[in-house]
A protein has these predicted regions:
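Short acidic-glycine-tyrosine-enriched beta hairpin
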Residues: 80-100
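Conserved short histidine dyad/triad with adjacent acidic residue
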Residues: 42-61
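Tight coil/turn sites that cap or link beta-strands
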Residues: 48-51, 93, 99-101, 111
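Short beta-strand His + acidic residue motifs that chelate non-heme Fe in jelly-roll/DSBH
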Residues: 29, 54-55, 75-76, 98, ...
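Double-stranded beta-helix
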Residues: 105-133
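His/acidic/aromatic-lined binding-pocket segments of jelly-roll/cupin-type domains
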Residues: 63-68, 88, 96, 105-106
Length: 133
């Protein structure tokens, strides 16, 4: 796997922590970030199906963060500095960071809900299509 992706499991705990998941009979609370600044916050869902994907691009400057609310997604990655291709499966409760010059495409293994955030406004010139996964 490329060094341009970082995956972190948010711990499930009753203890006070700035980043965690709390699962109770009444529902779930996820403390995703605390202290990080961001200017863009988005949400997307992705259904399983032939030809259904999100992404298919890379960024020269933007560092993207994602939180998996539910489901499982196969992420196809290409490190554009080394040419190395890899895949990883991300799932509910994981926080993911994708760094610049890493082409990425998401395909659902099961229907998924995802929060996306980053510390810049959306810049269409930094959303560069990529197809060679």
């Amino acid at each position: 796997m490329t060094e341009k992706i970082h995956i972190e499991e948010l711990p499930i705990t009753e203890k006070f922590m700035r980043q965690k998941r709390l699962i109770q009979d009444r529902g779930e609370l996820a403390l995703i970030e605390d202290g990080r600044e961001f200017q863009h916050l988005g949400y997307f869902s992705l259904k399983k199906g032939k030809g259904y994907y999100r992404g298919g691009h890379y960024h020269r400057r933007k560092v993207e963060h994602f939180y998996m609310v539910s489901g499982r997604i196969r992420v196809q990655l290409v490190d554009l500095d080394t040419g190395k291709k890899s895949e990883v499966v991300i799932r509910e409760g994981q926080r993911v960071t994708i760094y610049p010059n890493c082409a990425h495409r998401f395909e659902a293994e099961e229907e998924a809900q995802v929060i996306e955030y980053y510390n810049s406004m959306y810049d269409p010139e930094d959303d560069i299509p990529y197809k060679d996964f």
